[in-house]
Amino acid sequence: MLNNLGANVLGPKDCDLPKAALTALHAGVNSFGQLPVGPNLADLGGGAGGGGSSGGVPVGGGVARLHISGGLCDNSNALNGGNGSSGNGNGNNNNGNGNNNNSMQQQDQKRHRTRFTPAQLNELERCFSKTHYPDIFMREEIAMRIGLTESRVQVWFQNRRAKWKKRKKTTNVFRTPGALLPSHGLPPFGANITNIAMGDGLCGTGMFGGDRWSVGVNPMTAGFGQLNQSSPLSSSLNSGLNSGINMGSALGAGSYQHYGLNALGDSMMYQHSVGGVSCGPSGSPSATTPPNMNSCSSVTPPPLSAQPNSSQNELNGEPMPLHQQQQQQTHQHQQQQTHQHHPMAPPTPTQQQQQLPQSMQSPSDGANDTLHSIAALRRRASELNAIPSYLQMAPHNYEHYNSNSNSVY
């Protein structure tokens, strides 16, 4: 009853047949999948009747089931479906094989990196030193000699030429003088130093000049030699400068700066304070005399005579005698007195040169009395006020040094 209710309510099931009907169905199926009509139906009816004792199934229902089940449970359809699935699987396998073949071809097309041996590199470098652009015959010869292909040799030469051009460009930039510097630049060291410092009218030639310093020549010695030739300084200043430079080279830069440059700076600043005195081609002072020559003449002689001598004595290690200091002071006051007696007649440069050695050789005896007079001291103070401060320090330093040396000896 339950089977009949299920069959009537739910409808026929696929392949819901007894075992005997299934065996008869499989045995009686022809090549086209059609069921025979005659005896098979009787057998099916008998089989269905045998089961009908517990509730038989009419023959028509069995036929309908067979018809539906025959269309659904056909072996040929199952076989065809199986063949179709296998065909799809074969297609997938073929596609996979094709992809593998393509990947192998790509790997074959990809070039392997060539590793050159040292012997091959030496041969290639030797050929590159001969020519940078070898022809096809030379490349083939090189390839046969080192065991490479002509294309590899050609590529190596291309890379080597590119490297050579890049290296040449960088080396040219660093080797070219002034390539990395601005175009205008700065003037060379020592060019026209005296013209810049003291003016073109004071001294015509440069201290160091524009030429390069040669090997083995002291540049400071050469510069001071040119300056001494072109300046109107005395021979004592010349010897003082040379001895100062020699002692500086022997004792060090500190003593050289203390002696040589101080003497040079003091004497030049005295010369510059005179004004109007300029260097001619022969090294003698010109004949032009400024209107304030009377006030400057009493200041000019001490640096030209006293200071170089004192600096020379200091360089030689000898203390300056006391009578020389007295002679210098008396000479100064004597000149002051002469200028007071003759204010309207300024001496010419030749007369000044003649008066200088006479006053040094024969100092007057009465000058010691005027040294202590109040008027002379006032004039001395006014003169010292007229002299710049950096020039006033030089005589005091010399007197302090002489006093110390006298106390030692």
From Swiss-Prot:
**What keywords are annotated for this sequence in UniProt?**
Developmental protein, DNA-binding, Homeobox, Nucleus
Q: Subcellular location, in the record's words?
A: Nucleus
> Which InterPro entries does the entry mention?
HD, Homeobox_CS, Homeodomain-like_sf, HTH_motif, OAR_dom, OTP_Homeobox
The annotated region (Disordered) lies at: 81-114, 277-369
Function in brief = May be involved in the development of the central nervous system.
Polar residues bias: where?
306-315
> Is Nucleus found in the keyword set?
yes
Would you indicate the residue range of the signal peptide? none
Q: What is this protein called?
A: Homeobox protein orthopedia
Indicate, by first and last residue, each region the UniProt record lists as having compositional bias (Low complexity).
Answer: 91-103, 277-291, 319-338, 350-364
Q: Which PANTHER family match?
A: HOMEOBOX PROTEIN ORTHOPEDIA
**Reported tissue expression:** First appears at gastrulation in the ectodermal proctodeum and later in the hindgut, anal plate, and along the CNS.
Q: Which GO terms describe its biological process?
A: neuron differentiation
Q: Which cysteines are joined by disulfide bonds?
A: none
Q: Where is this motif: OAR?
A: 372-385
Q: Which residues bind DNA?
A: 109-168
Q: Which residues cross the membrane?
A: none
Q: Which organism is it from?
A: Drosophila melanogaster (Fruit fly)
